[in-house]
Amino acid sequence: MSNVGTPRTAQEIQQDWDTNPRWNGITRDYTAEQVAELQGSVVEEHTLAKRGAEILWDAVSAEGDDYINALGALTGNQAVQQVRAGLKAVYLSGWQVAGDANLAGHTYPDQSLYPANSVPNVVRRINNALLRADEIARVEGDTSVDNWLVPIVADGEAGFGGALNVYELQKGMITAGAAGTHWEDQLASEKKCGHLGGKVLIPTQQHIRTLNSARLAADVANTPTVVIARTDAEAATLITSDVDERDRPFITGERTAEGYYHVKPGLEPCIARAKSYAPYADMIWMETGTPDLELAKKFAEGVRSEFPDQLLSYNCSPSFNWSAHLEADEIAKFQKELGAMGFKFQFITLAGFHSLNYGMFDLAYGYAREGMPAFVDLQNREFKAAEERGFTAVKHQREVGAGYFDTIATTVDPNSSTTALKGSTEEGQFH
């Protein structure tokens, strides 16, 4: 019988937890025996998820002030362009999936209204696009990108329910090839974008269960997925319950018609929650309303006063009016200063949405008024980018793999006369 997929024993799992530096400082509220019991008799090998998680962790845990910055991708092709341009990770936000990439096929606000497996579906699509780009590059002998399969950090939102929902969603993320996932401490049924009003927190202990469940799913899958805890306590004014004594200093005593308790928002509850989440999370993210380095510094110092090695994440959000808050020189050094504070993963959540919408609007605006010159201007800018910066998608047939599949065709039949690129307008006109 084959040994492929043989599950780890409880002893092997425990030894990994005890000796692997990857797990320094990580708490699990379950045992190695329980993980072994949940594995089944065959454990699938999640190559992309495991490889991506290792790359991501090595990058964010490296000593020094270096950081990884990423843009939110909405499509597979956007992710390919990001990697081609030099980025080392891809971010996938639930907001963008809600807005234009969910399995319901509708446009939604960021309120967890779409099918729960939509984000894993887009993770898979992005990985498929990156795999194809890698295959094309290998056939062409193109070594300009050293790693096409960069880590993907994906949005688990508030988990779409309780601990079991989180477990299943995390499994789906891993199967799709996500390297990291983040989970926010909002009530799933009332979940809102971090920059909307009406956010309702769950008790601290309940979110620890969320993080614990996400970690358990990764352990059962034998994948070192990077688990990121997000707190929305900086702006949230409601909480479901006063059951957790750690939350009580911030509860005002007033209640709403729905039975929720009012809480005091701000930095202090964020730090308190982050300290509670730290043993269960690889990284921590405080959602904020403005690009405020002083606030970020106070948060980092507050958390690291108790957990000095805690890694942090930061949302460089498009919901901020950056130029209204900061001068150009401050914007230029913003991420570098965050990196020095320990914010080792920084991302622009909705970059894909804004790039896609403005790019098409700008082209359509010109085309509606000028006709063909508007598109030709775009094409000429593509040619220039190809010549000066390594942009390749101006050759659109090549970009989607026509040459790669020609290689397959001629491998099967060396005398094939039906290859696609030979004799194409692209071959003749796009040199």
Swiss-Prot record:
Pathway annotation: Carbohydrate metabolism; glyoxylate cycle; (S)-malate from isocitrate: step 1/2
Keywords, sorted A to Z: Glyoxylate bypass, Lyase, Magnesium, Metal-binding, Tricarboxylic acid cycle
GO terms assigned for molecular function: isocitrate lyase activity; metal ion binding
Chain residue ranges for the region called Disordered: 1-21
Positions of Mg(2+) binding: D155
Cofactor(s) required for function per UniProt: Mg(2+)
SUPFAM superfamilies: Phosphoenolpyruvate/pyruvate domain
Keyword field contains Lyase: yes
Record-listed E.C. numbers: 4.1.3.1
UniProt superkingdom: Bacteria
Binding residue positions for substrate: S93, G94, W95, G194, H195, R230, N315, C316, S317, P318, S319, T349
Complex and partners: Homotetramer.
Function statement: Involved in the metabolic adaptation in response to environmental changes. Catalyzes the reversible formation of succinate and glyoxylate from isocitrate, a key step of the glyoxylate cycle, which operates as an anaplerotic route for replenishing the tricarboxylic acid cycle during growth on fatty acid substrates.
Protein name: Isocitrate lyase
Organism: Corynebacterium efficiens (strain DSM 44549 / YS-314 / AJ 12310 / JCM 11189 / NBRC 100395)
Lineage: Bacteria, Bacillati, Actinomycetota, Actinomycetes, Mycobacteriales
Gene: aceA
